[in-house]
């Protein structure tokens, strides 16, 4: 008999993903085989499973919290916005098509049977499934074809816990309004509420909690404080809210250009966790002043973001930063932008477009998407700030729909191992001031990250920082801290009771 519980929210960014990871960690600590599940995820942060399937990063880090490998069944539908109106539809880890919102809304009912089959397949292998909804279940305009909130809870026949964010204000109105807009059978599925991101003395909430419980008949299971834990975020809302402002007193400042279609900004979590690194996400030219490294990150729409760079003045600012002797790095779409030429006869129909010209490369977009985890070795000789990383092993993953060819003046940055064969990747100039790669997750490799950060320190005349920091251990500690806080502030025994009362045979 598989047990399940689903977290839904009063809005986006209320903390569902993190709390779901916390429950995964708690059940894992308690000896239960646990898996996360989100039927449909809309995010530009994605990752690759060991068998080369693409899925949302949120379910990947939830799987890590549960002590298991990610499995594409944990996120069967991934929507990756390519513009304000279009999204790439990824089904079971592979690109299916592109659709606008209206077309996808009409298409969703055809996915229900497949989603339920995938969920049941996963549930047969685990003791507990922790499901996560998307946005709010009270989107009454989407209710009739819902496959991710109450529609999914109905398919899984599981209880729901509603998560509300008090930090944004109006928490009791959000709880009451959400429950009021649900149908009776949907309200009956909601067995508890968690108030999240509270700052201050919880005693101030007691009278409000009593009233909201009386008004709704739904118990508040706990009040989670605002936690200082370093865990991944699902989408760009956290960037807009300025979460990654960094620490002013750190020696090294790394600027990441916040592209309109930025993807996989989780690439930089390991950098931000370094004790001497300050991460700064930038959107204005003046914000590139006084940085030690500028990075163009991944993009879901390379040519659109390249046009934005030029229109916003950021392209000139990046080039000026480079002329001042500051290294510029590009990852995936950012790597493509650093080149001389981008040829797109597939995606945008814009044909041949000039890049920023910092790397003498030509990129051609392709129909097929490369999705794979890879091991790699940095080139044996690397210049400048990269020198100490020469020959180091690294690990990461590729998600791209293009091929980049190096021209005269560029050297290969690393060699990937694919099916036992060496494959060149990336480019670096002779002075090391321009460096690009398709490899996401590069900074999760501790030795590489410390080598390049120390290379940046050396450029400033600073001594190398010798540290035994391990990012994997750091993440494990964060999961444990989250679980400890949830046990302290949430009635976990009550959640167990809720699940046991609603467990279903699969």
UniProtKB/Swiss-Prot annotation:
Instruction: Please give the superkingdom of this protein's source.
Output: Bacteria
* Pathway stated in the Swiss-Prot or TrEMBL entry: Cofactor biosynthesis; adenosylcobalamin biosynthesis
Q: Which HAMAP family match?
A: CobQ
- Which CDD domains would you find in this protein's record? CobQ_N, GATase1_CobQ
What this protein is called in its record is Cobyric acid synthase
User: Which UniProt keywords are listed?
Assistant: Cobalamin biosynthesis, Glutamine amidotransferase
Which residues participate directly in catalysis? 332 (nucleophile), 440
- Note the SUPFAM superfamilies from the entry: Class I glutamine amidotransferase-like, P-loop containing nucleoside triphosphate hydrolases
Which part of the chain is the GATase cobBQ-type domain? Answer: 251-448
What does this gene product do? Catalyzes amidations at positions B, D, E, and G on adenosylcobyrinic A,C-diamide. NH(2) groups are provided by glutamine, and one molecule of ATP is hydrogenolyzed for each amidation.
The text of the family note is:
Belongs to the CobB/CobQ family. CobQ subfamily.
| InterPro entries associated with the record | Class_I_gatase-like, CobQ/CobB/MinD/ParA_Nub-bd_dom, CobQ_GATase1, CobQ_N, CobQ_synth, GATase_3, P-loop_NTPase
One Pfam entry name: GATase_3
Q: Which biological process terms from the Gene Ontology are attached to this UniProt entry?
A: cobalamin biosynthetic process
User: What is a GO molecular function of this protein?
Assistant: ABC-type vitamin B12 transporter activity
The record ties this protein, via PROSITE patterns, to: GATASE_COBBQ
């Amino acid at each position: 008999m598989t047990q399940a519980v689903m977290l839904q929210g009063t809005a986006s960014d209320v903390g569902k993903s993190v709390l779901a990871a916390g429950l995964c960690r708690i059940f894992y600590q308690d000896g239960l085989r646990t898996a996360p599940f989100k039927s449909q995820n809309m995010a530009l942060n994605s990752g690759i499973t060991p068998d080369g399937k693409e899925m949302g990063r949120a379910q990947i880090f939830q799987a890590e919290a549960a002590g298991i490998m990610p499995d594409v069944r944990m996120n069967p539908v991934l929507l990756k916005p390519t513009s304000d109106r279009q999204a790439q539809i990824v089904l079971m880890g592979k690109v299916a098509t592109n659709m606008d919102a209206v077309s996808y809304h009409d298409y969703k009912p055809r996915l229900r049977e497949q989603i339920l089959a995938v969920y049941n397949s996963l549930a047969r292998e685990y003791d507990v499934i922790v499901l996560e909804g998307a946005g709010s279940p009270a989107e009454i305009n989407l209710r009739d074809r819902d496959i991710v909130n109450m529609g999914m809870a109905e398919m899984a026949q599981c209880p729901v816990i509603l998560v509300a964010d008090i930090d944004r204000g109006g928490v009791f109105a959000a709880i009451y309004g959400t429950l009021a807009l649900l149908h009776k059978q949907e309200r009956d599925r909601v067995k508890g509420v968690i108030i999240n991101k509270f700052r201050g003395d919880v005693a101030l909430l007691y009278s409000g909690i009593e009233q909201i419980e009386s008004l709704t008949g739904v118990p508040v299971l706990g009040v989670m404080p605002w936690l200082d834990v370093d865990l991944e975020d699902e989408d760009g809302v956290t960037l807009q809210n300025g979460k990654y402002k960094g620490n002013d007193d750190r020696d090294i400042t790394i600027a990441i250009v916040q592209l309109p279609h930025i993807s996989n900004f989780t690439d930089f979590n390991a950098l931000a966790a370094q004790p001497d690194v300050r991460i700064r996400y930038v959107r204005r030219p003046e914000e590139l002043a006084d940085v030690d490294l500028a990075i163009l990150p991944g993009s879901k729409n390379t040519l659109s973001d390249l046009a934005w760079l030029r229109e916003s003045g950021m392209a000139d600012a990046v080039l000026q930063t480079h002329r001042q002797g500051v290294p510029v790095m590009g990852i995936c779409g950012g790597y493509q932008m650093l080149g001389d030429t981008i040829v797109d006869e597939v995606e945008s129909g814009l044909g041949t477009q000039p890049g920023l010209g910092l790397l003498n490369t030509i990129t051609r977009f392709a129909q097929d998407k490369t999705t794979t985890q890879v091991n790699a070795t940095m080139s044996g000789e690397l210049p400048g700030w990269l020198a100490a990383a020469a020959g180091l092993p690294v690990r990461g993953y590729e998600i791209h729909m293009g091929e980049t060819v190096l021209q005269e003046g560029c050297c290969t940055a690393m060699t990937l191992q694919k099916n036992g064969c060496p494959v060149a990747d990336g480019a670096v100039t002779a002075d090391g001031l321009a460096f690009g790669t398709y490899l996401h997750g590069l900074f999760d490799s501790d030795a590489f990250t410390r080598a390049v950060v120390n290379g940046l320190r050396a450029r400033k005349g600073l001594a190398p920082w010798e540290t035994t920091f391990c990012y994997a251990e750091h993440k494990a500690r964060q999961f444990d801290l989250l679980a400890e806080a949830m046990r302290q502030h949430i009635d976990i025994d009550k959640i167990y009771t809720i699940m046991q009362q609603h467990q279903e045979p699969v």
